[in-house]
Amino acid sequence: MSHISNAEWEVMRVAWASEEVTSSYIIDVLQQNHDWSDSTIKTLITRLVDKELLASRREGRRFWYRALISEEMGQWTCVSDTFAKICVVNHKTLIEKLVADTPMSLADIDDLEKLLNIKKFGAVDKVVCQCLPGQCSCQHH
């Protein structure tokens, strides 16, 4: 997936929320919370079409858009790209912070506990830094 800006992400969220949307609907939704002009939003839509993240079709004078990737795939790509930039030794601390800061139901917590119990079977003795020397401060080089 191509890198998308925060503003483009907002457009994708509108597209993910419905099977297919018009440009005017995207504009209406985003202008509720942003001071963006119609042309700015149309430019964002065009960029996403160019990046092959949105498909477009014309019906009369109206343009319809639909997401070409799932919301789950978009979210996973965003998170995995971020984690790829961070020393693997620090991932656990970040995950702990995410868990601490994320509202969860008891069922969500049960699911995480089950996942961690399964993860124990393939656990390594020590997580080894994969960074090039001089790229991080984890002191594992």
Placement of each model-derived feature along the sequence:
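Short beta-strand "wing" residues that participate in macromolecule-binding interfaces
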Residues: 56
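Glycine-centered, phosphate/nucleic-acid-interacting loop/turn motifs that mediate DNA/RNA or nucleotide
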Residues: 52
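Pre-recognition alpha-helix immediately N-terminal to the DNA-recognition helix
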Residues: 6-14, 25
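Short, cationic-aromatic polyanion-contact patches
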Residues: 3-7, 59-79
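Short, hydrophobic-biased segments on the C-terminal half of alpha helices
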Residues: 42-46
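Short acidic, hydrophobic short linear motifs in intrinsically disordered regions
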Residues: 21-30
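Conserved segment of winged-helix/HTH DNA-binding domains
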Residues: 70-96
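C-terminal regulatory/oligomerization modules of transcriptional regulators
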Residues: 100-141
